[in-house]
Regions:
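Cell-envelope/extracellular polymer assembly enzymes that use nucleotide-activated donors
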Residues: 54-56, 84, 234
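Acidic helix N-cap motif at the loop->helix transition within catalytic regions
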Residues: 69-70, 94-102, 109, 149
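A conserved acidic beta->alpha catalytic loop
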Residues: 74, 89-97, 112-114, 145
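Long helical/loop segments within the catalytic core of UDP-sugar-dependent glycosyltransferases
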Residues: 111, 115-125, 129-134, 148-149, ...
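Short beta-strand-to-loop acidic/aromatic patch adjacent to the donor-nucleotide binding site
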Residues: 133-145
């Protein structure tokens, strides 16, 4: 066997090893998401089943005066008699607190210049809710709007036995910008299709930073002390490690603004994907030990953590398709077909199937943009990487 053959063999094995975790995830979860489910009906329909159950909605906010009023009004339109909205105005230099109070929220002012990031604001809000005797908390981002059944669905799910919940999390109506439409499509796959599949299989749905909540017993057992740039993923891994399952509420949704600019989109991607790489380095050994010890419920979170970003996955599979190795080409074709099916299912679940299909024409440019960002994403995976807020569209 010549040196070229050896190199091709090593490259082929490496490509399979790094791309296989995501493919297994997509195959299992996309297939499961297509199965019918009646699990939520009991949780959502009983209008009086959650009487007396106190729910606090925590809204972390840093200089969100343009959007906080809309957010609070949206929450209070969803069964206002059963919820109290606590806005944590964290290191604000604008009128966020004034606008939140005007809309009907109670404001918790938190000014700690040495503490930045969403995790710090959430920790403060959760401590307040626990001290005041609330039965559960729900987190809504300041740039979001919620469905009118969200509060009732969350409360009933908690009363039905759920320890933690994640509502369906979408982007607000996609813009005419093709990259924005592709991001919305990727959002649908990651935040809707995959957790729906996990719910069908009885697995923990995941936490996506917006529209999630926990009972007070969970917070007392596992205080929210996650401080990474992806504190939601970090806390979910802590929940999984403790054997706590997050239920997925597909019928109740929260929708947030897409990044207003190219720089905002880049900042958001750096934070999310850099944070995921950091969690991969930190948690993979621990989850692997759990799996090897016979805890097979840790296998799916491990595969999820090892799964590459979809754009990078497609890029590597394209490389595999170009290599002169027959079995690897067959693998790449089958893998790309599976990804195509996943994308079609995500598009069908979204609000604009035709627009999503048109946006896919520009997918190669989106993939190149993601590959160009890899060095910045890797820098964002460092333990000392700062939490950088995504810029908002002030015209909303």
């Amino acid at each position: 066997m010549g040196i070229v053959s050896v190199l091709l063999f090593v490259m082929s094995i490496a490509l399979v090893v790094v791309t296989l975790p995501l493919l297994v995830e997509l195959l299992v979860l996309t297939g499961a998401a297509l199965l019918p489910s009646d699990s939520e009906k009991a949780n959502v329909n009983g209008k009086n089943s959650a009487v007396g159950f106190r729910l606090a909605v925590i809204v972390p906010a840093h200089n969100e005066e343009a959007l906080i009023g809309r957010c609070v009004c949206s929450i209070l339109a969803s069964r206002p008699q059963f919820v109290e909205v606590l806005v944590v105005a964290h290191n604000c230099s604008d009128n966020t607190a004034v606008e939140a109070e005007r809309a009907g929220a109670r404001v918790l002012r938190l000014n700690e210049s040495s503490q930045s990031g969403k995790g710090c604001a959430l920790h403060h809000g959760f401590l307040t809710a626990l001290a005041e005797g609330f039965d559960a908390v729900l987190v809504i981002d300041a740039d979001s709007v919620v469905s009118t059944n969200l509060v009732e669905a969350a409360r009933n799910s908690f009363r039905s036995g759920s320890q933690a919940v994640q509502c369906r999390y979408e982007m607000l109506a996609a813009t005419s910008n093709r990259r924005g439409q592709l991001m919305s499509l990727a959002f649908m796959g990651f935040n809707v299709i995959r957790p729906a599949g996990r719910e069908r299989l009885g697995l923990s749905a995941g936490i996506f930073g917006n529209g999630f909540g926990m009972r007070r017993e969970v917070l007392e057992q596992l205080p929210y002390e996650a401080r990474s740039t992806t504190e939601d993923l970090e806390y979910h891994l802590m929940l999984v490690d403790a054997g706590i399952r997050v239920a997925f509420l597909d019928s109740a949704h929260v929708a947030s603004e897409a990044p207003a600019s190219s720089s905002g989109a880049s900042t958001q991607r750096e934070r999310w994907e850099g944070g995921r790489f950091r969690m991969m380095k930190q948690w993979t050994p621990r989850l692997l030990v759990r799996v090897l010890s016979g805890n097979f419920r840790a296998l799916e979170p491990l595969l999820d953590l090892l799964g590459l970003p979809l754009a990078l996955e497609v890029g590597l599979l394209t490389v595999a398709l170009c290599l002169p190795v027959e079995w690897l080409r067959f693998y790449a074709v089958a893998a790309l077909a599976l990804i195509g099916l996943h994308v079609l299912v995500a598009a069908a679940k979204g609000p604009d199937f035709r627009g999503a299909m048109k946006a896919l024409v520009t997918a190669p440019f989106y993939i190149l943009w993601k590959l160009w960002m890899l060095p910045r994403i890797w820098r964002a995976s460092r333990a000392d990487a700062p939490w950088v807020r995504t810029s908002r569209d002030a015209s909303v």
